[in-house]
């Protein structure tokens, strides 16, 4: 099953792409940061279309929980700020919700 790895790929591609814009606009980095940023956002959009889901909305809803966890990992690994207990509790709640959406039984 490639669902979880694909969500993880999508999350880090989106975060990386958005961070390129953040770096340009908030950290005074070169506009050249936008080139890999836009490519990363393209990878993000492509990855979400690879999710095994019948409906885009369901794929996006489940992705939200994975994205939140990945964002906190990014904050810790790239920005050097460790998530606090409220970040951790909130992310855990969201990931549980995402897992219910991803793995919940569906009537066919």
From Swiss-Prot:
Cell membrane keyword on record: yes
Record InterPro entries: UPF0060
GO cellular component entries: plasma membrane
Highest taxon of source: Bacteria
Bilayer-spanning residue ranges: 4-24, 31-51, 59-79, 85-105
Localization in the cell: Cell inner membrane
Coarse class of the protein's main subcellular location: membrane
Membrane topology type: Multi-pass membrane protein
Entry keyword set: Cell inner membrane, Cell membrane, Membrane, Transmembrane, Transmembrane helix
Family the UniProt entry places it in: Belongs to the UPF0060 family.
Name under which the protein is recorded: UPF0060 membrane protein amb3269
Species of the source: Paramagnetospirillum magneticum (strain ATCC 700264 / AMB-1) (Magnetospirillum magneticum)
